[in-house]
Regions:
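N-terminal module of bacterial RNA polymerase sigma factors
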Residues: 1-30, 37, 116, 124-125, ...
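Acidic, proline/glycine-rich intrinsically disordered inter-domain spacer in sigma factors
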Residues: 102-141
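Short, Lys/Arg-enriched C-terminal cap helix and immediately downstream tail that follows
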Residues: 64, 85-89, 143, 148, ...
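Arg/Lys-rich amphipathic alpha helix in sigma70-family domain 2
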Residues: 62-64, 78-96, 104-108
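Conserved RNAP core-binding helix
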Residues: 24-28, 32, 42-59, 157
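Structural recognition of an alpha-helix C-terminal capping motif at a helix-to-coil junction
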Residues: 33, 47-54, 67-79
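Helix-turn-helix DNA-binding module
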Residues: 4, 134-174
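Sigma70-family region 2
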Residues: 13-14, 40, 53-68, 87-88
Length: 195
């Protein structure tokens, strides 16, 4: 942990409101993006992000400092997300069709900024980038929850295997195996969509 993180954690433990605001300013977008990509609904992701930060603020004393603060935040967010997905599944008797609907909502532009679209020039190329992002996000939304989590953490959030292991509590071999299966499933889904 960096000195800055150590001081921030100390201030959070002292229940310093400015430290809480700093925590949200520093990590809010990352946590929201993770939650949004896992759930596929902006409002749910916003609500869940608030719950995550409230939980973190209330339970900061449980943070041992063995890992980076951001890694612990991701773990709390991932756990909240899994619980919310289970709750929504029970509440709505969620089906594959509803996951498709979530992917379509995201594809309709209700999501985070486009992956890679900022690197493409020209209107026709921008449209291609947006379409590609929609296709990829729809395919990610169709993945099993555990596979979706490792893909989002590794390929979108660009976390190391070590950080993903700390967040998920899984051994590195399991993370790599799930990531391989998830990427294979994504490749298959993307190839089908190109036909």
């Amino acid at each position: 942990m960096s000195l800055r993180e150590i001081l921030l954690v100390r201030r959070l433990r002292e229940r310093d409101e400015k430290a809480f605001k700093e925590l949200i300013a520093t990590h809010g977008d990352q946590i929201y993006n993770l939650l949004y990509r896992m759930i596929g609904n902006q409002e749910e992701a916003k609500d869940l992000a608030q719950e995550v930060f409230i939980t973190v603020f209330k339970s900061i004393d449980q943070f041992r400092g063995d890992s980076k603060l951001s890694t612990w935040l991701y773990r709390v967010a991932a756990n909240h997300c899994k619980n919310r997905i289970k709750y929504l599944a029970r509440r709505h008797d969620r089906s594959t069709t509803e996951l498709d609907d979530a992917a379509e909502r995201h594809a309709a532009g209700q999501g985070a900024s486009p992956i890679g679209a900022g690197h493409i020039e020209g209107p026709d190329r921008v449209l291609e980038g947006v379409e590609l992002e929609r296709t990829v996000q729809a395919a990610i939304a169709e993945l099993e929850e555990d596979h979706r989590l490792v893909v989002v953490l590794r390929d979108i959030e660009e976390l190391s295997y070590e950080e993903i292991c700390e967040i998920t509590g899984l051994p590195e071999g399991t993370v790599k195996s799930r990531l391989h299966r998830a990427r294979s499933a994504l490749k298959e889904k993307l190839e089908k969509s190109q036909r």
